[in-house]
């Protein structure tokens, strides 16, 4: 039988504004401001998705010495994805700002400028010169190859992007899209 003693410690995730006490209407204003910053950048902006995600995590850790540590952790993140298209080509730009804090993090960011910058980048990469393909040696550390594949290819293969016609892989079922030496299985 153990006698548990709570351990006091310095909490690193103290917050000033609990996101779960802020009315939804105020949270919507944050994502609307982000959206408004992006929407008028160019007529080539065809889609803007903004999100605000706030989490509250209760953590309890116990050990065999009878010590118990309890904490509540908050994470807040605001995100924007902008799709630019010229009718032939399409480019997507994603960016986010987040902290292990409450909604006081919004005091540190100009959401209009953040949205505008993301939209400008989407348009800029839409008009960027094509990369010149070339063969280069690649060495991938064991275990990390999946992450590289995911970031390079799998985001474009996600069903929602393909179904909405936002992916370079749209309408490619049955077509060869990679080298014969590449095998990728999504299970």
Name what the model sees in each region.
Residues 1-187:
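Active-site bordering "gate/hinge" segments
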């Amino acid at each position: 039988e153990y006698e548990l003693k709570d351990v006091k410690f310095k909490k690193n995730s103290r917050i000033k504004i609990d996101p779960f006490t802020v009315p939804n209407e105020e949270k919507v204003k944050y994502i609307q401001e982000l959206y408004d910053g992006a929407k008028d950048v160019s007529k080539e902006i065809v889609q803007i998705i903004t999100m605000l995600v706030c989490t509250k995590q209760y953590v309890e850790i116990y050990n065999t010495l009878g010590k118990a540590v309890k904490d509540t952790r908050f994470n807040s993140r605001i995100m924007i994805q902008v799709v630019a298209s010229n009718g032939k080509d399409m480019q997507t730009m994603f960016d986010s700002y987040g902290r292990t804090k409450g909604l006081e993090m919004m005091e540190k960011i100009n959401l209009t400028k953040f949205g505008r910058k993301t939209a400008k980048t989407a348009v800029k990469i839409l008009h960027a010169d094509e990369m010149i393909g070339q063969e280069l040696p690649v060495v991938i550390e064991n275990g990390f190859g999946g992450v590289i594949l995911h970031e390079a290819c799998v985001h474009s293969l996600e069903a929602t992007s393909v179904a909405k016609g936002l992916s370079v892989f749209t309408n490619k079922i049955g077509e060869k899209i990679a080298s014969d030496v590449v095998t990728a299985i999504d299970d």
